[in-house]
UniProtKB/Swiss-Prot annotation:
Binds 1 Fe(2+) ion. Its cofactor is Fe(2+). The lineage of its organism: Bacteria, Pseudomonadati, Pseudomonadota, Alphaproteobacteria, Hyphomicrobiales. It comes from Bartonella tribocorum (strain CIP 105476 / IBS 506). It catalyses: N-terminal N-formyl-L-methionyl-[peptide] + H2O = N-terminal L-methionyl-[peptide] + formate. It comes from the Bacteria. Keywords: Hydrolase, Iron, Metal-binding, Protein biosynthesis. Disulfide bonds: none annotated. Its EC number is 3.5.1.88. Belongs to the polypeptide deformylase family. This is Peptide deformylase. Fe cation binds at C96, H138, H142. The keyword Protein biosynthesis applies.
């Protein structure tokens, strides 16, 4: 299982709307394994395919908080569709593997129900609350070209985007020198 490179802000692919998965096959299952390995290595709890540059409606999540292989409880979610969101809301301090080292409080519905296909292509539904609900919404947002910084004030969002554009420019300058 090769680890994949993470796409980070300001890469415009993060704003693309991902396309539905047409067929669940061995290649897609291998992609799911690569995504899980990448997510665990980066110490994340969720990863959308678009975050590794693949615009497919697919994500992986593991909010178990266990670092040991025997304790992991990964979810592979293909073509997710939110069926219901609660009126009750939660606030979590969110971060993102595509926006490293930046965190902000985001308010989202506390509970939701999602229909999806699992890694074998079987239709499933999950009802989630609290951290899992927040993580599902965060990752599904990626599939629709939205980032968690879209939920913070415009001033803060613009500041974050400028910071990451500057960081990318400095990185490109350093690479050109080498």
């Amino acid at each position: 299982m090769p680890m994949r490179s993470l796409v980070t802000l300001p890469d415009p692919i993060l704003r693309e709307v991902s396309k539905p998965v047409e067929q669940v096959d061995t290649a897609l299952q291998e992609l799911a394994d690569d995504m899980l390995e990448t997510m665990y290595h980066a110490k994340g709890i969720g990863l959308a395919a678009i975050q590794i540059g693949i615009p497919l409606r697919m994500l992986v999540i593991d909010v178990s908080g266990n670092a040991e292989d025997t304790q992991k409880k990964p979810l592979v979610i293909i073509n997710p569709e939110i069926l219901w969101l609660s009126d009750e809301r939660n606030v979590y301090k969110e971060g993102c593997l595509s926006i490293p080292d930046y965190f902000a409080e985001v308010e989202r519905p506390k509970r939701l129900r999602v229909r999806y296909q699992n890694r074998e292509g079987k239709q499933k539904e999950i009802e989630a609350d609290d951290l899992l609900a927040t993580c599902l919404q965060h990752e599904i947002d990626h599939l629709d070209g939205r980032l968690f910084i879209d939920y913070i004030s415009r001033i803060k969002r613009d500041m974050v985007i400028r910071k990451f554009k500057k960081r990318a420019k400095e990185k490109n300058t350093q690479e050109a020198v080498l």
